């Protein structure tokens, strides 16, 4: 399971001209589910993201977590994180999980964030979404539950 984590001042996601998710200060998480991923991967990433110290403390040091700053998370599914661009000019997505499995694990990830006490908004799985964010920092991290990077 892969995640792109971006610290934001605010973010929103729109589907069919309707805002379906919106946050203020917090994190936007683009989550991709891969072949062979399981609920343990979802738990690992949700717990890791909940505790990452990537917000500034009083001295301007990255020392506070999303929980410490009482921020929110906007979680958006994104199978294209498993795009393989090594051959040709069109990405291949054979590394991405099947939609039913991906949906189940994405929902497990979101539920774990909520269980960790985080206010969490989402996009709509398998829909075309317009995502608007205002990056803060910028702070952008790549996480992989298999620790591939």
UniProtKB/Swiss-Prot annotation:
Its EC number is 3.1.1.96. The keyword Cytoplasm applies. It is an enzyme of class 3 (hydrolase). It catalyses: glycyl-tRNA(Ala) + H2O = tRNA(Ala) + glycine + H(+); a D-aminoacyl-tRNA + H2O = a tRNA + a D-alpha-amino acid + H(+). GO terms for biological process: D-amino acid catabolic process. GO terms for molecular function: D-tyrosyl-tRNA(Tyr) deacylase activity; Gly-tRNA(Ala) deacylase activity; Ser(Gly)-tRNA(Ala) hydrolase activity; tRNA binding. A motif (Gly-cisPro motif, important for rejection of L-amino acids) lies at residues 137-138. Pfam families: Tyr_Deacylase. Keywords: Cytoplasm, Hydrolase, RNA-binding, tRNA-binding. The keyword Cytoplasm applies. It is found in: Cytoplasm. One of its GO terms (cellular component) is cytoplasm. InterPro entries: Daa-tRNA_deacyls_DTD, DTD-like_sf. Homodimer. NCBIfam families: D-aminoacyl-tRNA deacylase. Belongs to the DTD family. A Gly-cisPro motif from one monomer fits into the active site of the other monomer to allow specific chiral rejection of L-amino acids. An aminoacyl-tRNA editing enzyme that deacylates mischarged D-aminoacyl-tRNAs. Also deacylates mischarged glycyl-tRNA(Ala), protecting cells against glycine mischarging by AlaRS. Acts via tRNA-based rather than protein-based catalysis; rejects L-amino acids rather than detecting D-amino acids in the active site. By recycling D-aminoacyl-tRNA to D-amino acids and free tRNA molecules, this enzyme counteracts the toxicity associated with the formation of D-aminoacyl-tRNA entities in vivo and helps enforce protein L-homochirality. This is D-aminoacyl-tRNA deacylase. It comes from Desulforamulus reducens (strain ATCC BAA-1160 / DSM 100696 / MI-1). The lineage of its organism: Bacteria, Bacillati, Bacillota, Clostridia, Eubacteriales. The gene is dtd.
